[in-house]
Amino acid sequence: MYIEKGINSLGKFISLMIPLMTILMIVIIVARYFFGIGLTGLQEFVMYLHAFIFLGCAGYVHYKDDHVRVDIFYRDSSNSYKDNVNFILSLFFLLPVCFVIGFYSLELIEMSWKIREVSTEAGGLDYVYIQKTLIILFPLTMILTFAYQLIHKKWK
């Protein structure tokens, strides 16, 4: 199915950014504390990577069912019961939150692109509008994951 393949591909691609982000953080720390060099642009790039990883992988983690949850209510329950609880909670909590985030972020993203928003830091990156565009990844991937699970588990 295309949704499943897309979610898996996006999640695996984005997860490859984690070692890159870690290496860049080490470079920033070494440059600052051993050589006294501040790398503002690189620090902001790491923030961009962090946003990309967090917002882009949310749907993948939800799809894999590896997200953090409190299982005290249903850890010993049957799989069908867990599926029903997950479906109901996703329908009444996840989807509305995703729609609100998606709806209200569109104006923010549009304004950021219109003014070509740049960093307020000296030596910062000139692409804040690209970082703000990443916000929309979260609701999109979460809604796609919900749609896949609805089709796969409920209508199979």
Q: Which stretches of residues belong to each language-model region?
A:
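Alpha-helical transmembrane segments and membrane-interface helix-loop junctions
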Residues: M1-K156
